[in-house]
Amino acid sequence: CIIPKSAADKIVEKAKVDNFDFLSLQKESAEKRHSLIALIHALQEEVGGKEGEFVHYGVTTQDIVDTGIMLQTKEAYNIILDHTKDLISTLAKLTKEHRSTLMIGRTHGIHAIPITFGFKLSIWLDELLRSQRRLKQLLENDVFVGSISGAVGSYASFFGRGREVEKAVLKELGLAVPNISWQPSRDRFSEFASVLGIFSGTLGKIGRELFTLMKTEIDEVHEPFKKGEVGSSTMPQKRNPALIEGLASLTQPVFKDVDLMFQSLLIDGERDAIHWRNEWVALPEITSYLDAQIVNATYILSGLKVNQDKMLDNLNKQGALPYSERIMFEVGLKLGKQTAHEIVYQAAMTALEENKD
């Protein structure tokens, strides 16, 4: 043992949340200007005697904080992974249901050619499946590691048994063992954040698309609405896309936090706290916001009202114009594609200018 077993047993016995006054810890932390020293002193006092001298033995503050944050991050990851499965299942069901629901496709915000709503949803589904795959790869990449390596990560204070101690502790905690110290290497957190950022971007895009399709003049979808919900304090008739706006709006703070996580890569020497502490702000926000988006998206899609009649009306709004590509290729079989394009282009421009089909 690195420390006496009696000391280890006493430390385990006393290291309970209920044994600490967090207001006192906060006060001492502010006075000492150190994030962990107050807890170390409080635990030493709880343990007492000679055994108390072995509290925080061999490790450094960043070992404790990094390992603790990684445990929280892994717990958040597992929640996100579970909720992602529900989201994908919900979207897959909706996609199958609307595989033949005709609508107009839009490019640059303008009517293009016919598609199905199921086709649009399939693209979203494929993107979400890629995010799910990236999430699972985080485990394969050993992103969730702990750190029990001492002052500069060299195990100098473990009497030659540092790796042995680290492996035993991290096995107990369910974290992977790093190849070497990662105190100055924050790429794992940045990788985690970037994967979640991509996921959030997809959900933000879905939210923005649904926001557009729910506009009064388009009216192709509606988010779930319960009796008694209020859209406006001054306009009683309003049914606003409140859930959809919430889905879309959370992507921006996630993106900002992902950028903050990348700043934490810029560590000086063996470690510093200039950028390291960014993680304390960014990681909880990224995981919380993304999970809220996933849960929100699942609810929206599970109760989405699809106005198939309006989709068909919008498809037919410009008469035969959405079929100009097909007509061009049919004509092109005899005249050539470029010649056919010019002929159909002239006819289409005339129809648009004279408001004809």
Task: Show where each model-derived region lies.
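Glycine-rich anion/phosphate-binding loop at the beta-strand->alpha-helix junction
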Residues: S131, Q183-W276
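Amphipathic alpha-helical coiled-coil scaffold segments and their short linker/junction regions
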Residues: K167-A193
